[in-house]
Amino acid sequence: MYQHIPTAHSVRKFNFLLLAFVLFASIFPAILPASVSASSICSAVWDRKTIYTSGQQASYKGHEWTAKWWTQGEEPGTSDVWQDLGVCSTNPTNPPDPSNTPPTVPTNLAVTAKTSTSVSLTWAASTDDKQVIGYTVYYNDNLQAVTKTNATITNLTPNTTYTFTVKAKDNQGLESEASQPLKVTTDTDTLPPEPATPCRPAGLYDSGVKNIPYCQAYDQDGREKLANDSKRRIIGYFTSWRTGKNGQSKYLVTDIPWKSLTHINYAFAHVDSNNRVSVGSPTDPTNPALGLTWPEYPDALMDPSLPYKGHFNLLTQWKKKNPGVKTLISVGGWAESGGYIDENGKRIASGGFYTMTTNADGSVNQAAIDTFATSAVDFLRKYNFEGIDIDYEYPTTMNQAGNPLDWQFSTPRLKGLMTGYNALLKTLRVKLDQASAEDGKYYMLTIASPSSAYLLRGMESFQALKYLDYVNVMSYDLHGAWNEFVGPNAALFDDGKDGELIKYNIYNTPQYGGIGYLNTDWAYHYMRGMMQAGRINIGVPYYTRGFQNVVGGTDGLWGKAVGKNCPTGLTACGDGATGIDNIWHDKDENGKEEGAGSNPMWHAKNLEKGIAGSYLKDHGIVNPVLTGTYKRNYDSTLVAPWLWNAEKRVFLSTEDEQSIGAKADYVIKNGIGGIMIWELAGDYDWYKDRNDGKGEYHMGSTLTKLMHSKFLAATPYDASNSKTPLPADKLALKIEVTGFQLGDQNYPINPTLKITNNSNLTITGGSVIEFDVPTSTSAQFSSYGGDSVKLISAGHTGPNVGGLKGNFHRVAVTIPTWKSVAPGQSIDVSIVYYVPISGPTNYTITIDGKKYAVTDK
């Protein structure tokens, strides 16, 4: 064999070149391969979509690379634009080993499952001289890193072909060559999309009835079509009893500001002894709804072509003149939820809603509910109403919460009241939908709902809201003479100083999170758990509530007024204002005035101005002389005005242009559906010629017209329930919130989330269910059963002075790793929270990395 033996010349030449190379390297070290250093750490992995310019580095297949010039999409090692700097390591404590070899190529790449937006893959494991630490799945210019020999790729496009390859990676950062490519075409949607129902509002219960004419009442986006160019609802309750026949001021259909309203609710019908909707005898000439006439008023003459007289005759006439204004019959109210007033003015304790919905043993009285619902449809058809409003006060499990005269019916039925209430509203929804389809006329279902967290704690999570076109929140009567705590009737916000909440240490109890819950803003956010903003209407009172003999507070606010002669059933109460400070009072069963500080706003305006109204003797005020001065106060945090008479120590909570204007602005800002008014007859105008020419305030429409002017210029209300898009793929689950304790036992609130798998996919251990919960509760969630319940994000934390900041908390429940839920099976999860909520809503479930929206279909 020939062997080259170097000559002296060749040796000298080699030494010279070696010296030159060393000198050159000392001057230009950057051009030497990085492998001369054993501590090179890998840069970020090369990304096909990233732009790299001269000198920028990236790692690829366990090597470090530097770009020589501008590049994008050119794979290192396949183009001269990249310079190989040598082996690198992803672990600073484990420097690269130049002798390491890449893992073997993954084999047997196959599909195990696919949907419209996901593909599940598996492959055989790679081997390596060190250790395989993971794999990277490449597909259509995307990648996903995993640690196991399987992966679920999500967020794909339906009916699209993808090419998948897999590469293995070891603990030295080296990557194998790609597996054989696998082409997969995604399916169409996992569940066929629900057929679009034109005009039906998002979240409104689907009764299954076909051909419901939603588009009569709603536009294509599910927003209600509103009269008088208003962008938000203005709903006025018109009461039957201000007929003028008792010598007091009348308020008839002709006095309603029709051009400033979108809806009129007639108050009240009742549940009669046969469980039917009734307004009394149609043949009784003194019946305000059907028999009375007012020939002394030329604008209130009867239409003789109609088969009835009274308010209904006038409503029918004026409805023809104002066809866009919807009229609804309201059933119940405080006095007629558990009974009714007969033609002689006597209250008949029939049981009303309580016995109609719930049997004595707590079971649902479905037969009576069916009778009532059928009669409701008949009533709407006969008297030309466009819907029914249920004012049931109250189907709560809180003991002795409604009218004391109704406790004989409510107390033995507490455990079944909410179940019966849910059955009532569901049955009404179905019956009304059937009638709508038959008549080609859309019939609405609404309720008047309590707003106090105390009452709502006994109404579970208010699942019945889904059956409603909208809810009217009675965000008033938040303070009154039923207890001693002097405060505003209808504050918009909490101020952190509420005397009742301080008494019961609500602000300082950590579990409550500092949340004050006796205000309109809290009640609105409570409803958001089940309904979008546009299906919620906040309530405003056109009447006062007030106290006398007030001690402490600032101009009476947050003082105390302890009562001595409490109404039947109450052992403690407040000292409600009487006499000239209570002209709209109720009477007890003995005909005695009940102190409540209840007055129309027009009377409150006269008190504020020092005017003794000309109407006072008509209300039984024998000596109509004012004592002291009624000073107007206003708290901008609460958004609440009030009158304070220091001489009499009288506090009257009021509303006026400043507070109503602020509440209208709040409605607009938050995308809320509108405002509900109790009651229209309390609004005011100034009449300069009344009161013997001295002028006075009396029945008018100042506040209602102010609302209308603001809503004319507003944007349409918010018709969407969630700002976060839900996944396109859906999984059929039934999720129920059950197992609530009764009344005062329901604290902490600890129901069971019952999850039933109605899909054909097994819910594997470790799957995660997420949902939104309204910020009416604090951001504290746990489980009594050891279940994994965690807060993902908080919509609000801390006190809510001036209002809650967000709408929803996001909560996650994780299925135990050792547990799976096969199709048709159920699992129960314990949840604990502290302040009432409606909902939850916006459910999703993630199974093996794939996220689905939840549908109950």
Where are these regions (language model features)?
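Glycan-recognition patch characteristic of GH18 chitinases/ENGases
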Residues: 192-380, 572, 578-608, 614-615, ...
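Substrate-binding surface in catalytic domains of secreted glycosidases
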Residues: 276-302, 395-597
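Extracellular low-complexity, Gly/Ser/Thr-rich intrinsically disordered linkers
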Residues: 64, 242-243, 602-716, 737
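Beta-strand-rich modules
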Residues: 153-172
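Pro/Thr/Ser/Gly-rich low-complexity, intrinsically disordered linker/stalk tracts
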Residues: 98-127, 158, 176-189
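Solvent-exposed loop/turn segments flanking beta-strands in beta-repeat/beta-sandwich domains
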Residues: 126-139
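Terminal connector regions
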Residues: 816-857
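Tryptophan-rich substrate-binding surfaces of secreted polymer-degrading and adhesive proteins
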Residues: 35-100, 183, 187-188
